[in-house]
Regions:
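Flexible, glycine-rich active-site loops centered on histidine and acidic residues
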Residues: 2-23, 85-124
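N-terminal beta1-alpha1-beta2 module of alpha/beta enzyme domains
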Residues: 1-71, 75
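Structural motif
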Residues: 48, 79, 109-111
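Catalytic metal-binding/acid-base residues of hydrolase active sites
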Residues: 51, 81, 113-115
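Amphipathic repeat-derived elements
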Residues: 60, 66-70, 76-78, 100-107, ...
Length: 124
């Protein structure tokens, strides 16, 4: 069995204090969290793409590239890449580059997303 660690890039206020960190601080927290996967024995790191919401991971391959530089074995997966909003060739190139930089650890998981309003933001 393989077990992965996932972040969807949530950026919400603390339910107890109501305080919301800056985006830069939350990005740093996410990177620290994902980088801990390998030393803790997880097999895969998954970063999910989100736009225009309380989730701040618009380009998961950037996060995965950073994690690749900090690790040597953990698999690196998008969960998911919203293919309808991108040029498929560009996504293939991005993940092929990540795959080379990570010595073959990249996985691209694609989907259509769950937010119908997102298509308006991308003029679709």
């Amino acid at each position: 069995m393989q077990i992965g660690l996932c972040s969807l890039g949530d950026h919400r206020a603390d339910p107890t204090t109501g305080i919301r960190t800056s985006q830069a601080e939350r990005h740093a927290n996410i990177l620290e969290y994902l980088s801990a996967a390998e030393p803790l024995g997880f097999d895969t790191v998954v970063a999910g793409e989100h736009h225009f919401s309380d989730f701040i991971m618009a380009v998961p391959q950037m996060f995965l590239t950073w994690v690749a530089a900090q690790t040597s074995q953990v698999r690196l997966a998008s969960g998911v890449t919203l293919l309808p909003h991108h040029d498929a060739v560009r996504i293939a190139e991005d993940f092929a580059t990540l795959d080379v930089l990570s010595d073959g650890r990249a996985e691209v998981w694609v989907g259509k997303g769950v937010e119908p309003g997102l298509y308006r933001h991308f003029d679709q």
